[in-house]
Amino acid sequence: MKQGTVKWFNAEKGFGFIEVEGENDVFVHFSAINQDGYKSLEEGQSVEFEVVEGDRGPQAANVVKL
């Protein structure tokens, strides 16, 4: 599992990016957030996640808010 910080997240569109120190930003889709109900992330929020290879490159999976 990696840890990072939410760089930005557009709740209307349902996606954003997670910043990982010393690495490229990682795409995150709302469906990857482990949370019941409304799935969203806040800018600057700390998260833990796995990186998987998606159709358009690396993306976050199993995202957990810290």
Curated annotation (Swiss-Prot):
Q: Does the keyword Protease apply?
A: no
What's a Pfam family this protein contains?
Answer: CSD
Q: Which UniProt keywords apply?
A: Cytoplasm
Gene symbol here is cspA
**Gene Ontology MF: a single term:** nucleic acid binding
Q: Where in the cell is it found?
A: Cytoplasm
Gene3D superfamilies according to UniProt: 6.20.370.130, Nucleic acid-binding proteins
SUPFAM superfamilies tied to this protein:
Nucleic acid-binding proteins
The name this protein carries in UniProt is Cold shock protein CspA
CSD domain residues: 1-66
Gene Ontology cellular component annotations, sorted alphabetically: cytoplasm
Q: List the InterPro entries.
A: Cold_shock_CspA, Cold_shock_domain, CSD, CSD_CS, CSP_DNA-bd, NA-bd_OB-fold
Q: Say what the protein does.
A: Involved in cold stress response.
Organism expressing this protein natively:
Staphylococcus haemolyticus (strain JCSC1435)
Q: Which domain of life is it from?
A: Bacteria
